[in-house]
């Protein structure tokens, strides 16, 4: 029969293995190509441009059919991203203010990038896509980067 000390060590080892497995399964891998699509929220460009400046993007599909509007496509992309990566997807989408070439958003005729960035920060909120984030709320904190 196993001693009480051996059983305790086995239980402790089992608990540690479980903790490490859980941590590995929910790791913070939120980079394009790892945890996020290679070009996260590309489908949100049209919605952001429409809402910010009232303009469309040349070459983007135009549809008002339910389930296929720019908003629907954008929200589907956000919904399809894992909950713990949604804010990081928005961060990647808007880019960093210190690097004008980063992010998916671009200056468009009659629609500068800054207003687009400001609008994109609220994509996850109840007034737009209403998706839960890493904070267990439909909000992303600290997007002023």
UniProtKB/Swiss-Prot annotation:
Alphabetical list of Pfam families matching this protein: Tryp_alpha_amyl
One Gene Ontology cellular component annotation held by this UniProt entry: extracellular region
Keyword S-adenosyl-L-methionine: no
Lineage: superkingdom: Eukaryota
Localization (cell): Secreted
Molecular-function GO terms, alphabetical: alpha-amylase inhibitor activity; serine-type endopeptidase inhibitor activity
CDD domains hit by this protein: AAI_SS
Entry keyword annotation includes Transport: no
Keywords: Alpha-amylase inhibitor, Protease inhibitor, Secreted, Serine protease inhibitor, Signal
Signal peptide: 1-25
Gene3D superfamilies noted in UniProt: Plant lipid-transfer and hydrophobic proteins
Tissues in which the UniProt entry reports expression: Developing endosperm.
Miscellaneous comment as given in the Swiss-Prot or TrEMBL entry: CM proteins would be involved in the cooking quality of pasta.
Role summary: Alpha-amylase/trypsin inhibitor. It could be involved in insect defense mechanisms.
Family: Belongs to the protease inhibitor I6 (cereal trypsin/alpha-amylase inhibitor) family.
Protein name, per record: Alpha-amylase/trypsin inhibitor CM2
Species this protein is from: Triticum aestivum
Lineage per the UniProt record: Eukaryota, Viridiplantae, Streptophyta, Embryophyta, Tracheophyta
